[in-house]
A protein has these predicted regions:
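Membrane-embedded alpha-helical bundles of multi-pass transporters/translocases
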Residues: 2-473
Length: 473
């Protein structure tokens, strides 16, 4: 039996994409603002690394639990929307609060204040993002429609990376704010209100199917906690046995988190290598690195990757796009040139294929592996559990990347308090900036060599599931 696939209305795709913009803008703004912790609040590299690492460890623990809860929620609103709503509100309130930092409170107080509120913020992000991502996985059963949904979501979400780098310019501009600390406190309020409004859109405007009387769902109660725990563990075991899904997680871990380890170095390389530590002279060049890269991803990478995927298949498109990104990383070594800051812009088109291609394809491919899980293990479907485990890999890796960033800066001898860096410090940062993500990407390409869900197999699985569900009904 050939399964019937319903095309998702463009309005629904856009509503989903607005949630993606919020999900990307909150962390993007956080990354920009965190430079202020080093530059203006005096956080040393190790403290900076811990601020990155510890909240994300907590986040990585809570993600799979949230996935299980969402997958098994019985509600007339469905399994996703109410959590998206609550998570959006919690993120918004906490983001404003965590950035109300004042230098006169002292380094130790500011460190603990920010660390504790970061944990709460990431809890809100978990409550929002896990059911939100699952909502996207279950919007369509069609192999290519899934890619189109994620492509539109990523296209909208990429605007976060176009907009947010300009926050550097705003908070360091004396005509806007008296100090970067003041700029961060104020800008955090506007960013939070905007992102919270976007995050609420999927909860309010994407219709959910009632799960109130779904007997396939596990009962989540404190009285049933033992059964609930073992059902949760079984979901993890099922995911771990799903070899294509494990390959997606591993590839994402190596690509995204090797990139995350060196991402903040772009600011330091531009300011301290191209402009000898003069942030004022660096002007908008750090901003252009992020903003132009995001624009290229939005208007070049995502359309090309989406089209290639329909013609060549998702796996082959993944391999090609990641190979292109390695060329981009290598070009950065040659194109960061003091006195010619514009040269690094020529590396950005190829560099942008890495992350831009990764999430456009991987979120679609994860939905395909959820079908495989239903084929092998039956109902309930585990979109949120799979999404949570996938993003657990991303977030745990990001936590590790944050810690590694601080350790690498310490290892090479980088000191943000110095204008001119010690001999070898900038060379060390530049070597890591090129070599570290290139190695991570090569490992991911090797891992994906044996990924085996192509369009033909995906359609075969969908047909079997459609026939099975018809018989059940």
């Amino acid at each position: 039996m050939k399964p019937k696939h319903t095309q998702v209305p463009m309005s629904t795709k856009v509503f989903f994409g607005l949630g993606m913009l919020a999900m990307q803008m909150f962390p993007a703004a956080l990354g920009v603002f965190m430079v202020v912790l080093v530059q203006d609040f005096g956080f040393d590299p190790v403290m900076w690394g811990l601020i990155f690492f510890l909240p994300r460890v907590v986040d990585a623990i809570t993600d799979p639990i949230m996935g299980f809860i969402s997958d098994n929620t019985r509600s007339r609103w469905g399994r996703r929307r109410q959590y998206i709503f609550v998570g959006a509100i919690l993120m918004g309130i906490t983001f404003i609060t965590m950035w109300q930092l004042y230098p006169e409170n002292g380094l130790t107080y500011n460190f603990w204040y920010f660390l504790i509120l970061s944990v709460v913020f990431y809890l809100g992000l978990t409550i929002f993002s896990v059911p939100y991502v699952a909502l996207g996985y279950e919007m369509s059963t069609d192999f290519h429609e899934r890619t189109r949904i994620m492509a539109i979501a990523q296209w909208i979400g990429q605007w976060a990376w176009v907009i947010v780098p300009w926050f550097w310019v705003i908070i360091y501009d004396d005509s806007w704010f008296s100090s970067p600390e003041s700029g961060t406190r104020t800008l955090a309020i506007y960013v939070s209100l905007f992102c919270t409004a976007l995050a609420l859109v999927p909860a309010l405007f994407i219709k959910g199917k009632s799960s109130l009387h779904d007997e396939n769902l596990a009962k989540i109660t404190f009285g049933n906690i033992k059964t609930t725990f073992w059902t949760l563990i079984k979901g993890f075991v099922d995911a771990a046995k799903n070899t294509p899904f494990v390959r997606l997680c591993a590839a994402t871990f190596f690509i995204f988190n090797s990139f995350q380890t060196i991402a903040a170095f772009s600011f330091f390389i531009i300011v301290y290598y191209l402009f000898q530590g003069d942030a004022g002279a660096a002007g908008i060049w750090p901003t252009l690195h992020g903003s132009v890269g995001a624009l290229l991803t939005t208007f070049l990478v995502i359309p090309i990757v989406t089209r290639m995927s329909e013609k060549l298949g998702k796996k082959k498109t993944f391999m090609i796009s990641q190979a292109i990104s390695i060329v981009g990383y290598i070009l950065f070594w040659f194109l960061f040139i003091p006195g010619k800051p514009y040269m690094f812009l020529f590396a950005l088109p190829m560099f942008s294929f890495g992350i831009g291609g990764l999430f456009t394809l991987m979120m679609s491919m994860t939905a395909d592996t959820c079908d495989l899980d239903e084929l092998k293990n039956g109902l309930p479907r585990k979109e949120a559990t799979f999404g949570a485990i996938y993003w657990w890999m991303v977030k745990f890796g990001t936590a590790l990347a944050g810690l590694l960033s601080g350790l690498i800066m310490s290892y090479v001898g980088f000191d943000a308090n110095l204008g001119e860096q010690p001999e070898g410090a900038m060379t060390g940062l530049r070597i890591f900036y090129t070599v570290f993500p290139a190695i991570g990407t090569l490992i991911a390409i090797y891992d994906m060599k044996n990924y085996d869900i192509n369009e033909e197999r995906a359609k075969e699985i969908s047909s079997i599931l459609a026939e099975r569900n018809k018989e059940t009904n």
